[in-house]
C-alpha cells in the first residue's frame, strides 16, 4: 500500500526501514507507531503512544505513579490509541481522508496526539511496531525544558484540545489543572526560571482565549 512516513527534522529512521515495514501485517492495520529512541539509545517517553489515554484526574495521578500501565512495553507489539509524528507510518488513503484532523493550531505539541485519537474514534486501529525504529535528537531531558518557550506550547495546546474536541473530552478539567501544575512543580530544574514562568503564564492565557499560531 502507498504510505506516508512522518518524522521531524531532528529525527531520522534506522537503515532498512522499508524492509522492516514490508514484514509487518498490513491486512489488519493501516497506521503504525514506531519505536523512538534518543541518540543514546534510550526510549523517548515523549514519543511513546498511549495504550489508554489517562483522561481523568485519578488516571492522570496513576499515570504519574505507574506510567507503564498506560504505555506499551518498548519491545512488545500492541494496539495503541495515539501516535507521534516522529515515526508514524500511515496508509496514504487513510491520511488523505483525515487531513482535516491535523490542526495547525496545535503547532509543536499535541497535534499528533489529537490526530491519533481522532483516528481511533473513527474506527481505525493503530499498531505499536517496535520492529521499526527512529532516532530522535530531543531537547527535553528529564525535568528540564529547554529552550523555555516550549513550555508555552505545552500549556497552551493542552487547553486548546478542549476547544477542538469538546465531545468526547480527551481530558477532564481537573486532569488539565493537574497537568499544568506539573510544569510549575518542575520550576526548580529550569535554567531561566523567570523566562520559564513567563511562557507558562502566556501559554495558559492564550489557551483560555483560544489564541493559536507561532509564538516564540
Predicted ranges, named:
Residues 1-10:
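Short beta-strand-to-loop acidic/aromatic patch adjacent to the donor-nucleotide binding site
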Residues 149-157, 167-216:
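Non-catalytic, C-terminal membrane-associated alpha-helical segments of glycosyltransferases
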Residues 10-12, 106:
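Acidic metal-phosphate-binding loop of nucleotide-sugar-dependent transferases
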Residues 1, 28-29, 124:
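Short, high-confidence coil segments that cap the C-terminus of an alpha-helix
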Residues 16-47:
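Conserved donor NDP-sugar-binding/catalytic core segment of glycosyltransferases
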Residues 121, 125, 135-156, 191-195:
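Nucleotide-sugar-dependent glycosyltransferase catalytic core
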Residues 82-83, 87-101, 105-132:
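A short, conserved alpha-helix in the catalytic core of glycosyltransferases
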Residues 52-81:
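Short, flexible, basic/aromatic active-site loop/helix in glycosyltransferases
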